[in-house]
Amino acid sequence: MSEPKEKVLQMFKEHKIGTLATIRQNKPFSRFMLFFHDGLTLYTATNKDTHKAEDIENNPSVHVLLGFNGDAWKNDYAEIEGSASVEESAELKEKFWNGELKEWISGPDDPNYLLLKITPKSIRYYQKAGSE
């Protein structure tokens, strides 16, 4: 495995909260989300009755920022440009279920539980602000 890929995977493992940007009415909309990963593929959960679900249905292009934890500008982070789709697999919904989601979704069997799969088109990894 290449060193940059290893660094990105390690960062994905350490940083679960990031921003997800979608497009609505030709404008970007960002929100904080809880992310999980399988290799370089990202997953995030939402309620099916949200604007982001509608945004992705209309335009699957998304942008994710992961890595920054508020400690000045010294942290590694990544910008991920990708395509989002709905993941229907009950097995993956169970695998990526997290109790922190209970505020929005009652459990992995909740019919409103929508698991979004983000397939990267490009990943830019920064070791600190201003580097690439």
Over which residues does each language-model region extend?
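A generic local structural motif
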Residues: P4-K7, F29-R31, D49-H51, E103
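Short Pro/Gly-enriched beta-strand edge/turn motifs at strand-loop
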Residues: E14-T19, F96-E100
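Short beta-strand segments
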Residues: H15-D49, I56, V62-F68, Y77-E79
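Short polybasic amphipathic segments
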Residues: L20, I123-Y125
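Short hydrophobic-aromatic micro-motifs
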Residues: L42-A45, I80, L116-I118, Y125
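Short, structured beta-strand-loop surface elements
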Residues: K52-P120
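Flexible glycine-rich active-site/ligand-binding loops centered on an Asp-His dyad
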Residues: P120, G130-E132
